[in-house]
Amino acid sequence: MILRLLECRFFTIALCDAAEPWQLGFQDAATPMMQGIIDLHHDIFFFLILILVFVLWMLVRALWHFNEQTNPIPQRIVHGTTIEIIWTIFPSVILLFIAIPSFALLYSMDGVLVDPAITIKAIGHQWYWTYEYSDYNSSDEQSLTFDSYMIPEDDLELGQLRLLEVDNRVVVPAKTHLRMIVTSADVLHSWAVPSLGVKCDAVPGRLNLTSILVQREGVYYGQCSEICGTNHAFMPIVVEAVTLKDYADWVSNQLILQTN
């Protein structure tokens, strides 16, 4: 029984993108947006290491050469033009190298697709999500709509993740441009999926847009990232990326179920 639990747990994490215990790094990127965030983090971390090494070297050198035993009579240095120019220009160059990719990524994340293949609307409630697929309805029909609640711990099946599983997943096709419209029906929420690099605030009376391009099939887990009341921690988000054929079959089945 223990081996079965471990095996199921291993394959669940291997095939899904979710937070793990004692995780220190990022989840694997599934969108160009998230890959850009990870790359920017690595670039900035490189400069942080350079600055840390330089500051430590200067500190150790000062302690070694300018202590009381080495220099009983302290030197009186009140001005140094060269060093002042260096410590003014060098940080400015570093900030420039950080700012250019940062602004490029920021504006690419803020861009909204003019003609996306699929539009999905996420509506936050206390404490669940409602999703609307409005691309498949005619003028006299309702859109494909369903609610997504967290599965209670007592109802979890073997291998499902605690506090992260939902009864109805958001199913999307992989390698397809999506547009997410996020809003709220009551208080502030935030629709966030780390592997997709998405965190979009759900504000009552306002529609916020974000674009997503999932590059690989898989199951991606997220949660509401805005404190919204007592059960804020029980608003998970699950996005399942499938092939275009499987997505079309899922939409057809959902429309049939909704009609019946």
From Swiss-Prot:
The keyword Transmembrane applies. Component of the cytochrome c oxidase (complex IV, CIV), a multisubunit enzyme composed of a catalytic core of 3 subunits and several supernumerary subunits. The complex exists as a monomer or a dimer and forms supercomplexes (SCs) in the inner mitochondrial membrane with ubiquinol-cytochrome c oxidoreductase (cytochrome b-c1 complex, complex III, CIII). Binds a dinuclear copper A center per subunit. Residues 65-84 are mitochondrial matrix. CDD domains: CcO_II_C. The keyword Transmembrane helix applies. Gene3D superfamilies: 1.10.287.90, Cupredoxins - blue copper proteins. GO terms for cellular component: mitochondrial inner membrane. Residues 1-43, 106-260 are mitochondrial intermembrane. Cu cation A2 binds at residues 224, 226, 228, 232. Its main location: mitochondrion. It is found in: Mitochondrion inner membrane. It catalyses: 4 Fe(II)-[cytochrome c] + O2 + 8 H(+)(in) = 4 Fe(III)-[cytochrome c] + 2 H2O + 4 H(+)(out). GO terms for molecular function: copper ion binding; cytochrome-c oxidase activity. It comes from Zea mays. Cu cation A1 binds at residues 189, 224, 228, 235. It is an enzyme of class 7 (translocase). The chain crosses the membrane at residues 44-64, 85-105. This is Cytochrome c oxidase subunit 2.
